[in-house]
């Protein structure tokens, strides 16, 4: 069973990193990665249907324009059931508190521990065992 993941980060090299670190899962058809490079682009993509089913959004917090916390609030308004994992290089208590308050499923500090992230993804609703 394939599922989609939307990665939101204004740094284009993050897309390359995720493609590299999820190469095996992508080849096996476990995950289909989609990328947005701003909060606004993520909302445009979220308004459309994903094939296969979208099960999670991974969003950076610090982005120009709509930041990740504003994006999280908007996603939770439109799709309250959609898990959103916040990813940031700045893991301070205030950002963590706000992410929790706005409904983040996880708060991940960069550099991303991809083994841990993959374990967290396997626990999501809609993910085949």
Predicted regions: what they are:
Residues 12-35:
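Two-component/phosphorelay signaling modules centered on CheY-like receiver
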Residues 58-60:
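Active-site T/S-Asp motif of two-component receiver
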Residues 63:
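Receiver (REC) domain active-site loop signature in two-component systems and cognate sites
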Residues 70, 91-108, 116-119:
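Alpha4 helix (beta4-alpha4-beta5 surface) of REC/receiver domains from two-component response regulators
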Residues 113:
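Receiver (REC) domain switch/active-site region of two-component response regulators
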């Amino acid at each position: 069973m394939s599922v989609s993941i939307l990665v939101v980060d204004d740094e284009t090299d993050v897309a390359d990193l995720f493609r590299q670190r999820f190469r095996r899962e992508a080849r096996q058809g476990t995950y289909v990665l989609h990328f947005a490079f701003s909060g606004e682009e993520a909302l445009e993509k979220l308004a459309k249907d994903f094939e296969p089913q979208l099960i999670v959004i991974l969003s950076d917090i610090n982005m120009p324009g709509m930041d990740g916390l504003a994006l999280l609030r908007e996603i939770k308004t439109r799709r309250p059931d959609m898990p959103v994992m916040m990813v940031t290089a700045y893991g301070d208590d205030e950002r963590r508190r706000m992410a929790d308050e706005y409904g983040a499923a996880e708060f991940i500090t960069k550099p991303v521990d991809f083994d841990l992230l993959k374990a967290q993804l396997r626990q999501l609703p809609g993910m085949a065992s």
